[in-house]
């Protein structure tokens, strides 16, 4: 293994790989990771764009990084990303992706200048009693015993955490603390989720701890992340000649498996109801998005509930991964992630304010003008006494370029979609 330190090698451009002009790439999915792979193949791999194929079952790129206005429904953002200084791969890439708003600058330039001029921080992290400040006051409110429970998990070998739950390591010393309120709502953790996942998150985001209570560690984009991140990447790839194949489901990837190596040989696809196959050679690279956090998502509206459908459908990432995993156990165990929807589902909604009388109530909580064009809530505001454990956030407005100037978009999400509401007396998933 070769190691380097410092930034000596960070800015040196790689030589053109030998034989790259004979190689092709097939990328399954078009989310942030898939588009990143394509961008690196173009920039660093110097592969010809027309030899890069992105296979996407939906009509647009972006995966979970979406932002769209649907006719008769309105603006929809299923989720959002919270970025920080240590997204090294992302910042390395976006320094090379041109802005689609400002000529001559990169996406990273825009992002850096925005967050330097308008730094992110929250003035109200949680509420109780219908909008009153819960006065978490930047405190973790955790005992020495609770801190030791977190430390114990942090230092437990991964092998010992297989099939263990968070509640196997944390008791009320942690689970009733402000720390857990901050953490679980920021990262969408349930008490019964994987202890190993919890440990890996702590390791990955340990530098967040100081900025956890007020979100000072976070950075956000100007618009929704489809317009701010995905669209510039798509434009960059299209200009390079990368081939986008929308409406193409990848049903399976078949491997030639030998003791010493495993090689993808065939991609089984479906387009317009017809199945076909792509035969692969030693000059073909395959990048697979296996599973996905919005794979089985459904959409409702003001008058129609989102369908709660737990079926794993053919042509989706989870079903494809199952078929790949059946070929060899080293390809993992997808059912660990997708077989318990009651324990893993959550719900989000995008709310557009049409009545200006709502805005003063929002301002009273977040202590900022929602239509100022600057940071508003600075991250989620958690309704601490909500049966749904509901949180909401307002990023810089407008969130869409097409958004009316006097309208505000609020993103809402909750962890307990099966619980009866405090005001609306039915489960969130029935709303």
Model feature map: region roles:
Residues 64-67, 197, 297-302:
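Short, solvent-exposed loop/turn and secondary-structure capping segments
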Residues 203-285, 290-291, 303-304, 309-318:
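Helical element adjacent to the flavin cofactor pocket in flavoenzyme catalytic cores
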Residues 1-25, 43-51, 69:
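Extreme N-terminal leader/targeting segments of oxidoreductases
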């Amino acid at each position: 293994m070769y190691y380097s330190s410092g930034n000596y090698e960070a800015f040196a451009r790689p030589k053109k790989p030998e034989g790259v002009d004979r190689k092709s790439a097939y990328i399954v999915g078009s989310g942030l990771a898939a588009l990143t792979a394509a961008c690196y193949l173009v920039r660093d791999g110097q592969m010809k764009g027309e030899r890069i194929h992105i296979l996407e079952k939906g009509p647009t790129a972006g995966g979970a990084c979406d932002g769209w206005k649907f006719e008769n429904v309105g603006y929809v953002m299923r989720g959002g990303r919270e970025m920080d200084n240590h997204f090294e791969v992302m910042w390395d890439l976006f320094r090379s992706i041109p802005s689609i708003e400002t000529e001559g600058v990169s996406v990273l330039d825009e992002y850096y200048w925005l967050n330097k001029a308008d730094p992110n921080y929250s003035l109200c992290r949680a509420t109780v009693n219908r909008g009153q400040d819960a006065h978490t006051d930047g405190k973790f409110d955790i005992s020495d015993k609770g801190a030791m429970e977190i430390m114990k998990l942090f230092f437990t070998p991964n092998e010992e955490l297989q099939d263990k739950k968070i509640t196997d390591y944390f008791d009320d010393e942690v689970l009733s603390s402000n720390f857990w309120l901050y953490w679980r709502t920021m990262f969408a953790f349930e008490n019964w989720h994987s202890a190993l996942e919890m440990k890996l998150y702590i390791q990955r985001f340990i530098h967040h701890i100081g900025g956890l209570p007020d979100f000072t560690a976070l950075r956000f984009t100007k618009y929704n992340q489809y317009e701010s991140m995905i669209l510039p990447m798509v434009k960059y790839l299209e200009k390079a000649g990368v081939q986008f194949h929308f409406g193409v489901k990848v049903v399976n990837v078949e491997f030639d498996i030998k003791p010493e190596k495993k090689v993808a040989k065939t991609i089984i696809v479906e387009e317009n109801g017809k199945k076909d196959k792509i035969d692969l050679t030693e000059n073909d690279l395959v990048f697979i998005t296996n599973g996905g956090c919005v794979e089985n998502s459904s959409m409702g509206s003001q008058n129609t509930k989102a369908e709660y459908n737990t079926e794993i459908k053919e042509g989706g990432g989870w079903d494809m991964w199952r078929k790949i995993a059946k070929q060899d156990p080293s390809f993992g165990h997808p059912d660990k992630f997708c077989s318990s929807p009651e324990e893993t589902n959550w719900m989000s909604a995008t709310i557009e304010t049409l009545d200006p009388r709502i805005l003063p109530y929002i301002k009273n909580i977040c202590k900022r003008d929602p239509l100022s064009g600057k940071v508003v809530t600075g991250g989620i505001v958690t309704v601490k006494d909500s049966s749904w454990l509901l949180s909401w956030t307002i990023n810089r407005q407008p969130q869409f370029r097409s958004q009316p100037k006097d309208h505000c978009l609020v993103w809402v999400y909750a962890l307990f979609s099966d619980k009866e509401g405090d005001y609306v007396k039915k489960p969130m998933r029935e709303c």
